[in-house]
Swiss-Prot record:
Residues 368-570 form the DhaL domain. One of its GO terms (molecular function) is ATP binding. SUPFAM superfamilies: DAK1/DegV-like, DhaL-like. GO terms for cellular component: cytosol. It catalyses: D-erythrulose + ATP = D-erythrulose 4-phosphate + ADP + H(+). It is an enzyme of class 2 (transferase). Keywords: ATP-binding, Carbohydrate metabolism, Kinase, Nucleotide-binding, Transferase. The active site is at H217. Pfam families: Dak1, Dak2. This is D-erythrulose kinase. Disruption phenotype: Cells lacking this gene are defective for growth with D-threitol and are totally unable to grow on erythritol. It comes from Mycolicibacterium smegmatis (strain ATCC 700084 / mc(2)155) (Mycobacterium smegmatis). It comes from the Bacteria.
Length: 580
């Protein structure tokens, strides 16, 4: 259990305060994460890694010479926002471009690609790459669907060494692709991990068993097996990884036996003795192995085995020196191109027109209703946090409730601030959407941000939107989710509640029903649709590898969307009664 914290909701922020103070020789804080304490030298590609926290030393612990130039730090097991990723990349960038790289998770892929788009619009050359090493998360031939777990480390290390050597951005991306194609990982869990403040783990493993094929975000394994001896575990891991080996003739391999947070180093060394013997018996030469904690999952008990097949180039980068807070190899040279950073900051946005200048009285009246709706949503989601987390943990990482609370709380504050500045309903929704995406992180954060900003763009800041405009705004929101999320109705996502909600609202509005009444009826339809997702199997996201396990449990994203729709309906009813 994660026992030491102040406010569980601020665990990541509090962790960063201590980390930065303890490692000021290596890193400084910037909005969204950390960068090297020394500026990036001219001509060097900046490598920015990242993801949710809870994996230390991944990701902030490997920022320094020979490794990453920056790390984007999200909330526990939650993708950082696009704004945070872009902020860290700007701070790390010198003049040769930026590679942003993460494990292959929907939220990271969405947010970091959005960050790349933003950086390119500012004239910064940027690329994104996702690691896909987890052999348990998708079958051979479907490698693009695989998660990134401890193989993140080998890919990040080689790409960073290539950048340190002076390769251009295309060359660094090529090395990342080669390292990823050569890397395979299989993990096991003996017990689940517990989020700060929670009184139970995200999953449990029956006594005397282990979960095979775990994820690093608290996702349980894809199957359960009886707990073997150390020798038996070594054989399971070696057979699993080598059984999926790439079509490569190389017999020289980099190997990581990675602890997940609670498994003792002494235990890992016992297992390593067996792993190394099995690999050598099969004719492999092990190059500079790593045994220890490199990519963890809070206090999860378990370990994983990673193998990267080495050609001459990858071996050079794997063996290259590095000097970071948590990982050191050889003697890495400090490249200083100027004064030591005191702090790097993201570019400040230019100020636009004052919000009050864009609105009229009707728009400001609508803004007051929108702000009240965000108040109500934040309270409803706070009450539902534990249940949403429980639903999400059945086949996912259990962070949905916490992410929705952080997002809705940030949206509530942003809406209130915009309202105080005289904003109309469109600007209030826009501000709330941006805040939700920035603070919630993860897949749901970026999707809710897109939903709210699309709705706000349609409603505008002047006049009182009629029922047809509101229905069109909801359709715009749905279309934004389709464009950004890559999911479709039936995939067991929030779309399975959003589409019925949208269609019912449109149908009733087309029959001249008031939007208030239509919204209530549509919310009821969305609630039933969310419940019906219990019968679906997820086809996208972290729950996909555990699709069968999720049957019988509704989708957390659909459930929370329906809850928000009902809450808005209640808020509208109260407001209407107040006017009467």
């Amino acid at each position: 259990m994660t026992k030491l914290f102040n406010d569980p909701a601020r665990f990541t922020e509090d962790m960063l305060v201590g980390f930065l103070d303890a490692n000021s020789r290596y890193v400084v804080g910037v909005p969204g994460g950390v960068v090297r304490a020394q500026t990036t030298r001219p001509g060097k590609v900046a490598v920015v890694i990242g993801g949710g926290s809870g994996h230390y030393p991944a990701f902030c612990g490997t920022v320094g010479p020979g490794f990453a130039d920056g790390a984007v730090v999200g909330n526990i097991f939650t993708s950082p926002s696009a704004e945070e990723a872009a902020s860290v990349a700007r701070a790390a960038h010198s003049d040769a471009g930026v590679l942003l790289t993460t494990g292959n998770y929907a939220g990271d892929v969405m947010n970091f690609n959005l960050a790349v788009d933003q950086l390119r619009s500012e004239g910064i050359e940027a690329q994104y790459f996702a690691v896909t090493d987890d052999v348990a998360s998708a079958e051979r031939g479907q490698e693009a669907k695989r998660r990134g777990i401890a193989g993140d480390f080998t890919v990040f290390k080689c790409a960073s060494a290539a950048a340190e050597e002076g390769l251009d951005l295309a060359g660094v991306v090529r090395v990342a692709e080669a390292a990823n194609a050569a890397t395979r990982t299989l993990g096991v869990a003996f017990d689940g991990c517990t989020l700060p403040g929670a009184d139970h783990p995200l999953f449990t493993v029956p006594e005397g068993h282990m979960g095979l094929g775990l994820g690093i975000h608290g996702e349980p394994g894809v199957s359960e097996e009886k707990m073997p001896t150390a020798a038996g575990l070594a054989a399971t891991l070696v057979d699993g990884v080598l059984g999926d080996r790439p079509d490569a003739p190389e017999k020289r391999i980099a190997v990581i036996l990675n602890g997940l947070g609670r498994t003792k180093y002494e235990e890992l060394f016992v297992v390593w003795g067996e792993v190394s013997r099995l690999l050598r018996d099969r004719g492999y030469t092990i190059v500079e192995p790593e045994v220890g904690e490199l990519v963890t999952s809070l206090d999860m008990a378990g370990c994983s085995l990673t193998v990267m097949w080495l050609d001459e180039e990858l071996e050079r980068y794997w063996a290259a020196p590095a000097d970071t807070p948590a990982y050191k190899k050889g003697a890495a040279q400090q490249h200083v191109s100027g004064e030591r950073r005191s702090e790097a900051t993201a570019r400040s946005a230019s100020s636009g027109p004052k919000l009050a200048e864009l609105s009229d009285e009707d728009g400001r009246a609508g803004a007051r209703l929108v702000a009240r709706a965000f108040d109500a949503m934040a309270e409803a989601l706070a009450d539902a946090e534990e249940e949403l987390g429980r639903i999400d943990a059945v086949a996912g990482d259990g962070d949905h409730g916490r992410g929705m609370v952080k997002g809705s709380s940030a949206a509530r504050e942003a809406a209130a601030s915009a309202l105080s500045e005289g904003a109309g309903q469109g600007s209030v929704l826009n501000a709330a959407g941006k805040a939700w995406a920035a603070k919630a992180g993860g897949t749901s954060g970026v999707l809710w941000g897109a939903l709210l900003t699309a709705l706000g763009a349609r409603l505008g800041d002047t006049g009182r939107p009629d029922s047809s405009v509101i229905a069109a705004g909801v359709r715009d929101a749905y279309d934004a989710l389709i464009r950004l999320g890559g999911a479709a109705p039936g995939d067991k996502t929030m779309l399975d509640a959003m589409l019925p909600f949208t269609e019912e609202l449109e149908r009733r509005v087309a029959q001249d029903e008031s939007w208030q009444s239509a919204w209530r009826a549509a919310a009821d339809v969305a609630t039933e649709a969310a419940r019906a997702t219990a019968d679906l199997r997820p086809k996208i996201g972290r729950a996909r590898p555990l699709a069968e396990r999720s049957v019988g449990t509704p989708d957390a994203g659909a459930t929370s969307l329906a809850l928000c729709a009902r809450t808005v309906a209640d808020c509208v009813t109260l407001s209407t009664q107040g006017e009467n």
